[in-house]
Amino acid sequence: MIIKPRVRGFICVSTHPTGCEANVREQIEYVKARGPIANGPKKVLVIGASTGYGLAARISAAFGSDAATLGVFFERAGSETKAGTAGWYNTAAFEKFATEQGLYATSINGDAFSDAVKQRTIEVIKRDLGQVDLVVYSLAAPKRTHPKSGEVFSSTLKPVGQAVNLRGIDTDKEVIRETVLEPATQDEIDHTVAVMGGEDWQMWIDALLEAGVLADGAKTTAFTYLGEKITHDIYWNGSIGAAKKDLDQKVLGIREKLAAKGGDARVSVLKAVVTQASSAIPMMPLYLSLLFKVMKEKGTHEGCIEQVYGLYKDSLYGAAPHLDDEGRLRADYKELDPEVQDRVQTLWSQVTNDNIYELTDFSGYKTDFLRLFGFEIAGVDYEADVNPDVQIPKLVQV
């Protein structure tokens, strides 16, 4: 079938297998061109490995450090008549390229929040790898079923304490829109912490430690975004911020446990990028469009692969990691450059329906958004027939 992009709201409901493969190939080529990561990881578990930063973490480990990788995610296969999810095609492509290079790559498809997926992951590590020396936690999910109580939690994106007026781009109509977000209830805050806080990361590390599958000196990191004052009302000071603060608390206990084995645990702060998650946040398309404009003009623009490869090379495995006062690893310093933020802040209030394309890089934002789903990739023939039924040969289905 011939597959074209079909966008509904902030989700593209079609995906292109060949485009997803080309996107993965581009990221692999970036890593190979930058050269090996000195003293990098050798056996890596990535939880949330199929898109965005998690996929970039898997690619950087495999092609920057010749690491064996085990990826965990929750994706949907395609059929002859219906496309699967982008993460499915990304993983099929990643495994193909890794296998061609003689690298171990196996994936587990299921609910990473569940005990069943944790146990199956441990079985696969014991069988194939013995132990892992890096665990990357990069889950982005709207809901979580608690593995012990069975309670279902849903995350909410709201301010805390008071309503907030937000500017944003209505990405469908391409107009500037002001929205009011009402404050989260305590229940909504608690739910958001349960989904996006550090409890599940802690459960993963506890399970891996108990099973004896974490190597001496093993590291773990969870990815997060903090942002600057423009996004603080909705991020750091909002319901999601409560979850981020929980992550900062939980990492202390995890670090203590791993330190006993000569290892380490860190929260890694990454820059704002276009992801399926960020496109759902009312103000982020406008913020990202302005950020891209300013950072591209300065020559400091980066996407997922540049960020994560840099994080590995400079901080996770570098001699002089970029640490903040809270002990987090920082890869977002180019975004937080005062010159960049001041310029974004100035343009923020100047954008109108008439000058969106002039003052922002909204066209670059739209291209990046479509690239998530395998579209707008150079060299791909989008008029060609493509089979959406793509297999992942080594997939473990839970």
Swiss-Prot record:
UniProt-annotated binding residues for NAD(+): 48-53, 74-75, 111-112, 139-140, 244, 273-275
Positions of disulphide bridges: none
Site positions (Plays an important role in discriminating NADH against NADPH): 75
Subunit relationships: Monomer.
EC number: 1.3.1.9
Pathway it works in: Lipid metabolism; fatty acid biosynthesis
Active site: 235 (proton donor)
Positions annotated to bind substrate: 225
GO MF, one annotated term: trans-2-enoyl-CoA reductase (NADH) activity
A Pfam family recorded for this sequence: Enoyl_reductase
Gene3D superfamilies: NAD(P)-binding Rossmann-like Domain (3.40.50.720)
InterPro entries: Eno_Rdtase_FAD-bd_dom (IPR024906), Enoyl-CoA_Rdtase_cat_dom (IPR024910), FabV-like_NADH_b (IPR050048), Trans-2-enoyl-CoA_reductase (IPR010758)
Name the UniProt record assigns to this protein: Enoyl-[acyl-carrier-protein] reductase [NADH]
The family this protein is said to belong to: Belongs to the TER reductase family.
Catalytic activity entry: a 2,3-saturated acyl-[ACP] + NAD(+) = a (2E)-enoyl-[ACP] + NADH + H(+)
Enzyme class: oxidoreductase
GO biological process: fatty acid biosynthetic process
Keywords: Fatty acid biosynthesis, Fatty acid metabolism, Lipid biosynthesis, Lipid metabolism, NAD, Oxidoreductase
Record function comment: Involved in the final reduction of the elongation cycle of fatty acid synthesis (FAS II). Catalyzes the reduction of a carbon-carbon double bond in an enoyl moiety that is covalently linked to an acyl carrier protein (ACP).
PANTHER family: ENOYL-[ACYL-CARRIER-PROTEIN] REDUCTASE [NADH]
